[in-house]
Structure formats: C-alpha cells, structure tokens
Amino acid sequence: KYDPYLMKVVNQDTFKWYALEDGKTYGYPNYSNTKADYESGNIPVNDNFVIREDVYNALGKPDVSTPENFEKVMQQIKEKYPEMTPMGFTTVGDGAGPFLDKLQDFLGVPLEDKNGKYYDRNLDKEYLEWLKTFNDVYRAGNISDDSFTDDGATFDEKVKQGNYATMLVAGTSGQGGNFTEFMKKSGTRYIAIDGPSSTSGRKPTLNQTGISGWLSNYITKDAKDPAKVTQLFTYLIDEPGQILTKYGVEGVTYAYNDQGKIDYLPEVKKLEQTDNDAYNK
C-alpha cells in the first residue's frame, strides 16, 4: 500500500514466518537467518571456547576436547598460574547459562532420534559425562563460586583484566569490546580453540540467530507518515541500506577494491583492532 518495492527486498521466508493468523505481516526483524542462509556456509558461529594465547602456548597448545584432558589442563593452569581462574563462562542468569543448549551444541547432541522423534538432550550420555567433568573441575577449585553469581558488568570487567585462563562463551560477538580491551592492556589475547567435544565422533552443531531474528521492528498505527516509515524500512533492508549499516559511508569508512569488493579503510581496520567500542559507534 505505502511502498510496493518493500516486497521485492524483504526475504520472503522471513516475511511469511512473521505472518499472523489473518495472513498479514506486521513486523520485520533486523537480523534473520533462513535455512538457505545456513546452507550457504556464510553464517559465523557466535559461541566459542576461548583461551588466553599466552597460556595456550606456555602449556604447549594442549588438547581439551576430551573430559580427561580438559580436567588435566585445568589443573595445570591452576598450578602454573595461581593468580588466574582456570575456567570462566558467560553469566548463568536464571537458567544454566552456556551449560545447557550451548554445551549440547558443542557436543553435537541431536534434537531428534534416527526415527525423527523427540530426543531429550538433557539426558544424553555424553552431555551428562561432560557435566560431571565440569563439576569435578569446580570441586578441584578450578571454577570460582563467583562465576555462578556474577552479573554481566562484573563478568565483563574480569574478561577485560584477563582473570580467566579459559572461557565457555555464549555470544562471542558481545565480548568483542572486552577482548579488545584485554589485548590492549596485556599484549596477549583470547583465541578460540576446539573445546569440549563429542567422544563418539559427533560433529558440533553450533547455532546462530534463526529466522525469528534478533530485534523486531514495527510501524505503529499512530505513525504520522507511514509511507515515509515504510520507505525507510525498504531502504534499510535493501542493499544500499545494508552496506550503510554494516560498512558506513564510502570514502569515509570503506572503499571498493580492484575486485569490486568492499574494504574498510586502514584507519577503520586499526580502530577495530585497538578500540572496539569506538569502532562499534
């Protein structure tokens, strides 16, 4: 009604998914991944097991993919770096934090059995074995009591100080500023490695935002100029708007290279590596 071109730029799978019982769609997400997006192989994971690079190298780049090795390495860290907490993790909140579906994804725990029926991931044998391993690590003093009660701000500060030798991180993108701040202060950094893994050969099934998206946007009935708002939606969803919100302004933050692809300008790349908060702004 207000901008027919909108229907040409929206992702039809996402648009239809948002339709209500009356068949109409009233909102659209700012970030949505469809089945085709996942199958393209271009969707980065957002959950990682990370370790301080200096610790990793000092210990000879150890393997922590099995329960036995994991427990042994945590003890080695405790003995070699008594000032650090061997393992930390993103905030638990009201649930189990990264120790529920995130850990299950690392272990490749299926959602359904071979017959297509519901599979209770919480009772998976390998998952329970890893939970016991984490409990043993905790009882050995290699996971702090504070990790279960720290709020987001407290956890962030500990990451900036490099207090944790290793971490199970749910939502790595949200830690970019903290990782950069630590790197600036310390001369080392956190790196992602293969963490807890399946002992039976299952591949990890790390997840990302699905078709429902992240934040949903709506045009209210009280909008004074719904046509203008719809046109803004169209622009932001279309390629020019996507480039603007991702890369900024041509000649100011990015330029096209000889292959016709977008490259950040050198000063922007440097800002990303040295001041993540300023880069995000």
Predicted ranges, named:
Residues 1-281:
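Extracytoplasmic/secretory soluble proteins
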